[in-house]
Amino acid sequence: VVHTLSREYGRRGFIVRPGKKAGMALFLPLNILEADVVENPKSELWSLRGIQVRDSLSGIRGSIRKNTMTLFLSEVLFRTLHDGAVEDGLYQWCIGSILTLNAMESDFANYSIRFLLEFAGALGFRPSFADIAPFTQDYAPQMRSMLECSFSESMLVPMSGQVRNSLCESALRYLEYHTDQTIRVKSLSVLRELYG
C-alpha cells in the first residue's frame, strides 16, 4: 500500500504491485508520480497501474540532507492529513514545494521550518508571529524572521542546529494545536541528527 496526495482524491492509500524494472525506487518520499487509478467496486482500497515518475528530482535524490528532509516532510503530511481529505490548493502547493527544494543548490538548511509554516497556511491557518509565539520558547527572534522574511531571505537566517530543531518542533506543536491532533513524527529524530 502506498499513501498518496493527489488533486482528485486528496490523501489516499492505493495498492501497488511494483514491477521488477523500477521497483520500490518509484516510491521514495515525496516522489511526484503519474498513474492510472483502478477502482474496485468491492473494496475501498483501489490500485494504481502504469506508475511513472513525473520528475526525477535529481536535486533531492543526489543529496543525503535533502533525502532526509523529504523523509521528515512526507511523514508530517502523512500524520497530519486524513484519508480522503481534499484541501483546495494543497496538492499544487505540495508540488511547488517539492520542486523548490529540488531546485535549491545551497542554503536549504532552514527549508523544513519554512515548509511547516507554509503547510499551516496551505491548511488555512497561516501563522502570524503573535499566533505562533507561545509555541516558540527561547527562539522567538528566529521564528519572527522565518515568518516575516521572503522565502530566499528566510533560507539565510543564521541559526544553529539546536535552534533549527526547536523551531521545527514549535511549528509541529502549532500544527497540532490547529488540527486538534497529536502529530508524532518519528523521523524528527533523524532530522535532529542531521542538524546536530
Predicted regions: what they are:
Residues V1-H3:
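Short aromatic-glycine-enriched beta-strand elements
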Residues L5-G196:
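Non-catalytic alpha-helical scaffolds and adjoining flexible linkers that form interface surfaces
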